[in-house]
C-alpha cells in the first residue's frame, strides 16, 4: 500500500479551505497512510510565502492576499492555472527536500517537453522557465518528514494579475503559459500528462485517480 498514490482532482476551489485540508492531512497522517497529489484550480488569490515581503505586493486591488506557510514569496493563483499539491512522505521515499524540488522541476520540464516546449530550472530561483519567463512556480513545506504545498503551472489564464506583484520577489519577472507556447489550453489535458510523468519519476506502483470536489483529507 505504501507505494500507492492517490491523485485527487478537486476542480475549482477557494485557496483557504484547501490549504487547511492540507494541514489537517499532514498533521494527522501516519507512516502507513498513502501519499496523495491534489490537483486543483483556484479562484483568484495572491499567496505570500514564509519569505514574503509586503512591498512585493504592488497593488492587490480586488484580489485577496493570504499569508501562507509555504516556502518562497508572493505568487498569484487563478482560473486556467494547474496547481498540484504534493502530500508525500519524503522520509519513506528517502528524499531530501532538495531532491523533491528537483523531482518536481523535472516533472514539469518533462510534461512541457511532451508539447515540444523547452524549459529549464534555475539554481537561483526555484520553478521552471521558458526563455527566461516563468511558467511554473514552486513552494513547499516539510513537516514530520512529509511534504505539502507544491507547484502552480500556468496553462491558459489571465496573466495580468502577476503585474500587480513582484512574482516570487523578482521585480519585472515575466510570466509564460502553456497555451501561448503551442501547448493545450485545457487543464484536463495537462493534468493527464503531469500524472503520467509523476508516476514514472517518483516511482509509484499503483495509482488511484479520484475526481471529487470534496476536500476532506482522509487517506
Curated annotation (Swiss-Prot):
Domain of life where this protein originates: Bacteria
Keywords per UniProt: Acyltransferase, Cytoplasm, Transferase
Cellular component terms (Gene Ontology): cytoplasm
Disulphide bond pairs: none
InterPro entries: aa-tRNA-synth_II/BPL/LPL, BPL_LPL_catalytic, Octanoyltransferase, Octanoyltransferase_CS
Active site: 168
Site positions per UniProt: Lowers pKa of active site Cys: 134
E.C. designation(s): 2.3.1.181
Binding-site positions, substrate: 70-77, 137-139, 150-152
Catalytic activity from the UniProt record: octanoyl-[ACP] + L-lysyl-[protein] = N(6)-octanoyl-L-lysyl-[protein] + holo-[ACP] + H(+)
Entries under Pfam families matching the protein: LplA-B_cat
Pathway terms, separated by semicolons: Protein modification; protein lipoylation via endogenous pathway; protein N(6)-(lipoyl)lysine from octanoyl-[acyl-carrier-protein]: step 1/2
Main location: cytoplasm
Enzyme class: transferase
HAMAP family on file: LipB
Misc note: In the reaction, the free carboxyl group of octanoic acid is attached via an amide linkage to the epsilon-amino group of a specific lysine residue of lipoyl domains of lipoate-dependent enzymes.
Record protein name field: Octanoyltransferase
Organism: Vibrio atlanticus (strain LGP32)
Amino acid at each position: 500500500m505504501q507505494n500507492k498514490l492517490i491523485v485527487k482532482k478537486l476542480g475549482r476551489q477557494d485557496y483557504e479551505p484547501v490549504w487547511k485540508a492540507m494541514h489537517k492531512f499532514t498533521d494527522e497522517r501516519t507512516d502507513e497512510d498513502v501519499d496523495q497529489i491534489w490537483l486543483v484550480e483556484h479562484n483568484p488569490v495572491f499567496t505570500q510565502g514564509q519569505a514574503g515581503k509586503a512591498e512585493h505586493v504592488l497593488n492587490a486591488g480586488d484580489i485577496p492576499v493570504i499569508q501562507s506557510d509555504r516556502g518562497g514569496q508572493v505568487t498569484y493563483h487563478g482560473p486556467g492555472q494547474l496547481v498540484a499539491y504534493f502530500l508525500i512522505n519524503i522520509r519513506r521515499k528517502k528524499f531530501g527536500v532538495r531532491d523533491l524540488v528537483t523531482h518536481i522541476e523535472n516533472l514539469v520540464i518533462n510534461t512541457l517537453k511532451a508539447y515540444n516546449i523547452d524549459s529549464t530550472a534555475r539554481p537561483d530561483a526555484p520553478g521552471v522557465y521558458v526563455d527566461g519567463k516563468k511558467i511554473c512556480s514552486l513552494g513547499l513545506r516539510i513537516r514530520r518528514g512529509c511534504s505539502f504545498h507544491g507547484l502552480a503551472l500556468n496553462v491558459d489564464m489571465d496573466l495580468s494579475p502577476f503585474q500587480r506583484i513582484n512574482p516570487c520577489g523578482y521585480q519585472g519577472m515575466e510570466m509564460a503559459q502553456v497555451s501561448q507556447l503551442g501547448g493545450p489550453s485545457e487543464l484536463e489535458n495537462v493534468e493527464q500528462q503531469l500524472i503520467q510523468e509523476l508516476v514514472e519519476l517518483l516511482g509509484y506502483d499503483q495509482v488511484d485517480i479520484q475526481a471529487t470536489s470534496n476536500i476532506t483529507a482522509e487517506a
